[in-house]
């Protein structure tokens, strides 16, 4: 463009005036092949106390497609004042998310072309007029992928598009495309690993839709092990199949339909007459998709496995959040290595899954154990075996009524501190335990239960009334039930978008099961304020975080006694809300095994509706005792440092070591200088939080209500501590205000009072002038203009006031 000085143009101008014209001139269709400002991530949710916000994320400037949802290339633009290659690294990051081999960086002068299909010359500079055509990139892409001519009709098949604008997320697109690619290449066993809450069923639908529409697969079976999974799938994601789809009922497979949704239990069973799958020939289905395939399809002795073996010629796609790999069960042995994996950690980092905090509650009998006196009878007259009972026994072989009530009381107290209407799932050891927990919660919440008898419901496989409320529990628009007690039924497939509290009072040894249970809370619902959740752990299940197989660590781990939650005057909320992030831990991981527990689900017994019961109540003999004095333990606080290590030392020692090893805080003088030089002290406070300094925990150890500045001067540098009130008194003694006119003195004096009450963060924000008693003096802009002249003068006065506040007493030589 003659006469245009590119160096004065913005990045947007460069895209509009130079890059897009070059791309269009090369033959790319603006409607179907070019997308601008493509947002690939949602932005990680960061929890700050009780509030949560998203980190802002950048979007890819331009993505080029062969056709919608089949991406080929990324173009990253920069203003002309930058080098032509400036955007390359950013573009490569987007390209890895989209699984594309081509990246173009440009500042409007030309392009740097990164071409993974050409290892001999990975990067080259090309002119604007030499931008590749769609056909050129598609041919190179197909060669890079190794596609044959026969595969092209399948891999080019359109996605389903309902016209609403809904499109797959980048990882769903990768999972769909890689699976379709694998099927088109003739692969018959495929595994997809996607974290709970990331849209596995929608992903499965698009895979099936494309293969079905391409006539590559004509008869499809979708297998699940829970009625709710099948019903949700039919009603929601699979709805576009319309009259071509059916749910298998009455143990009858109707060959008139092309897409069949079935419970495993509805088409097989221990008796020959229950094996409905044999009604059709072994080659009837040519595609089988197995939802939650970790639950048994890969187990050699599984009843479900016989279905897969009968239809052995069909392509079989396993979907799971948690592939099972034990001596007895291996998804990978059966399906092969996953064609794509999207982990819990990635989901949280990308902002598609909710982060969480953990509160561990220690009860004395859990830690110390309990032993009956010799010959002691339980409350039903059974003699209790004389041995020490511990955490693994409680609610499994030994029931202590007082422990049940203490757990229920702690749950109740937590909800009262937060919100009694927060959706809560309580995972219990078995149906009996879930029933007793429901009763205890009803007894402790009479005011809520009187408002609505469905405030607490037991939702287990044996209870038709409870199961009938499952849809209401997971419906964000329904307030009741609020608390669901369960054992196995809700561990998988329950889309509880608004669940804000997950309670673990169940012995969990399986990493697979643990991940599934955590997944009940990871869904996000911004409309209803669900951006993060809390795990309340009574059975040390969250020690599985230490297992290397676990990813997606909690924001915070807090170990407390029940009294910390029930005591209104305790600092439980402040500790839980302290703004630190956790990335790891050093707990003993000896519990992280996939061993089969002594007490397990009896898969031989089925409910009348074709679903397995949660457990077999006659499997283990239980003793029921009461009158046990159940106490709480001394409080232990664990916290994560900036390196993600779980710290148990004195927090004062940790703070001192952390500060002194940082050169900016290595001496009192350097700390004071940095503090005084900072235009806003809040910036320093937040910076120190990133180093792992927890102000609430530190203040509790010191035992005084000190300003962050004085906490550090005292703990790290050995200075005598001054309270905020003492600092205010010192400022007033020095007659500092006489340099200002009376109207300004009035404002500064009031700011000083605000500092004494609230701290330095309060007075640094100009919005403080909207609060009482400033509101009686006029609007903020009037206060600043009439009493200080302008905003700059006001900010300077506040800064000088802070310097007066933080003057150190003279040090002796």
UniProtKB/Swiss-Prot annotation:
GO terms for molecular function: ATP binding; DNA binding; type I site-specific deoxyribonuclease activity. It catalyses: Endonucleolytic cleavage of DNA to give random double-stranded fragments with terminal 5'-phosphates, ATP is simultaneously hydrolyzed. GO terms for cellular component: cytosol. CDD domains: DEXHc_RE_I_III_res, SF2_C_EcoAI-like. Residues 181-341 form the Helicase ATP-binding domain. It comes from the Bacteria. It holds the Pfam family EcoEI_R_C. ATP binds at residues 195-201. Keywords: ATP-binding, DNA-binding, Endonuclease, Hydrolase, Nuclease, Nucleotide-binding, Restriction system. Residues 410-561 form the Helicase C-terminal domain. Its EC number is 3.1.21.3. Residues 568-591 are annotated as: Disordered. The restriction (R) subunit of a type I restriction enzyme that recognizes 5'-GAGN(7)ATGC-3' and cleaves a random distance away. Subunit R is required for both nuclease and ATPase activities, but not for modification. After locating a non-methylated recognition site, the enzyme complex serves as a molecular motor that translocates DNA in an ATP-dependent manner until a collision occurs that triggers cleavage. Type I restriction and modification enzymes are complex, multifunctional systems which require ATP, S-adenosyl methionine and magnesium as cofactors and, in addition to their endonucleolytic and methylase activities, are potent DNA-dependent ATPases. Belongs to the HsdR family. The type I restriction/modification system is composed of three polypeptides R, M and S; the restriction enzyme has stoichiometry R(2)M(2)S(1) while the methyltransferase is M(2)S(1). This is Type I restriction enzyme EcoEI endonuclease subunit. It comes from Escherichia coli.
């Amino acid at each position: 463009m003659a006469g245009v000085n590119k160096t004065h143009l913005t990045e947007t101008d460069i895209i509009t005036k130079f890059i897009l014209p070059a791309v269009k001139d090369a033959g790319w269709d603006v409607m179907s092949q070019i997308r601008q400002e493509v947002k690939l991530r949602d932005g990680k949710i960061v929890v700050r106390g009780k509030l949560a916000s998203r980190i802002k994320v950048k979007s890819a400037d331009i993505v080029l497609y062969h056709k919608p949802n089949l991406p080929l290339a990324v173009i990253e633009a920069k203003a002309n004042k930058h080098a032509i290659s400036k955007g390359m690294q950013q573009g490569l990051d987007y390209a890895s998310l989209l699984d594309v081999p081509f990246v173009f960086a440009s500042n409007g002068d030309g392009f740097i072309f990164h071409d993974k299909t050409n290892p001999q010359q990975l990067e080259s500079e090309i002119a604007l007029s030499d931008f590749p055509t769609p056909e050129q990139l598609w041919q190179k892409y197909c060669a890079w992928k190794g596609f044959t001519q026969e595969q092209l009709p399948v891999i080019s098949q359109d996605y389903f598009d309902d016209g609403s604008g809904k499109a797959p997320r980048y990882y769903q697109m990768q999972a769909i495309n890689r699976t379709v690619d694998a099927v088109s290449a003739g692969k018959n066993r495929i595994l997809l690993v996607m974290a709970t809450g990331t849209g596995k069923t929608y992903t499965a639908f698009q895979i099936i839709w494309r293969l079905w529409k391409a006539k590559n697969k004509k008869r499809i079976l979708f297998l699940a092990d829970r009625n709710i999974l099948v019903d949700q799938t039919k009603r929601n994601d699979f709805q576009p199949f319309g009259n071509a789809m059916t749910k298998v009922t009455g143990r009858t497979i109707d060959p008139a339909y092309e897409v069949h949704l079935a419970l495993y239990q509805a088409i097989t069973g221990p008796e020959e007459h229950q094996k409905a799958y044999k009604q059709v020939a072994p080659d009837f289905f040519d595609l089988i998709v197995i939802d939650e395939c970790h639950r048994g399809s890969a187990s050699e002795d599984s009843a479900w496995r016989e279905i897969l073996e009968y239809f052995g010629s069909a392509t079989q796609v396993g979907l799971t959040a948690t592939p099972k790999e034990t001596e007895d069960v291996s998804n990978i042995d059966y399906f092969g290595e996953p064609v794509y994996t999207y982990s819990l950690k990635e989901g949280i980092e990308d902002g598609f899954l909710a982060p969480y905090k953990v509160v561990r509650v220690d009860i004395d009998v859990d830690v110390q154990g309990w032993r009956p006196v010799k010959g002691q009878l339980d409350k039903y007259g059974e003699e209790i075996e004389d041995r020490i009972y511990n955490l693994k026994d409680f609610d499994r072989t030994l029931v202590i009524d007082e422990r049940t009530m203490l757990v229920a009381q702690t749950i109740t107290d937590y909800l009262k501190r937060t919100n009694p209407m927060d959706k809560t799932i309580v995972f219990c050891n078995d149906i009996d335990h879930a029933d007793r927990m429901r009763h205890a919660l009803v007894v402790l919440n009479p005011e809520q239960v009187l408002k609505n008898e469905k405030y607490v419901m037991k939702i287990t496989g044996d209870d038709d009334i409870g199961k009938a409320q499952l849809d209401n529990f997971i419906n964000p628009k329904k307030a009741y039930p609020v608390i669901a007690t369960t054992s196995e039924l809700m561990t998988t497939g329950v889309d509880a978008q608004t669940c804000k509290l997950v309670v673990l009072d169940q012995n969990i040894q399986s990493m697979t099961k643990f991940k599934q249970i955590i997944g009940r809370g990871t869904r996000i619902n911004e409309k209803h304020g669900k951006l993060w959740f809390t795990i309340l752990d009574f059975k040390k299940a969250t020690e599985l975080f230490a297992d290397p197989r676990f990813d997606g660590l909690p924001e915070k781990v807090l170990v407390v006694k029940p009294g910390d939650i029930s005591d209104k005057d305790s600092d439980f909320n402040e500790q839980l809300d302290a703004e630190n992030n956790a990335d790891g831990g050093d707990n003993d991981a000896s519990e992280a095994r996939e061993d089969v527990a002594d007490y397990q689900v009896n898969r031989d017994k089925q409910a009348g509706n074709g679903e397995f019961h949660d457990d077999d109540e006659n499997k283990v003999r239980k003793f029921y005792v009461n009158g046990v004095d159940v106490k709480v333990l001394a409080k232990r606080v664990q916290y994560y440092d900036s390196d993600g290590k779980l710290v148990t030392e004195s927090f004062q020692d940790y703070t001192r070591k952390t500060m002194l090893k940082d050169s900016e805080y290595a001496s009192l003088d350097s700390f004071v200088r940095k503090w005084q030089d900072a235009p806003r002290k809040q910036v320093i406070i937040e910076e120190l939080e990133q180093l792992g300094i927890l102000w609430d925990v530190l203040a509790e150890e010191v035992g005084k209500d000190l300003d962050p500045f004085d906490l550090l001067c005292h703990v790290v540098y050995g200075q005598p501590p001054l309270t905020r009130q003492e600092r205010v008194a010192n400022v007033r003694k020095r007659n500092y205000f006489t340099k200002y006119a009376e109207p300004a003195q009035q404002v500064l004096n009031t700011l000083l009072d605000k500092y004494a009450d609230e701290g330095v963060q309060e007075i640094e924000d100009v919005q403080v002038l909207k609060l009482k008693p400033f509101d009686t003096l006029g609007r903020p802009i009037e206060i600043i203009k009439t009493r200080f002249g302008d905003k700059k003068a006001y900010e300077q006065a506040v800064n000088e006031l802070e310097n007066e506040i933080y003057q150190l007493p003279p040090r002796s030589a």
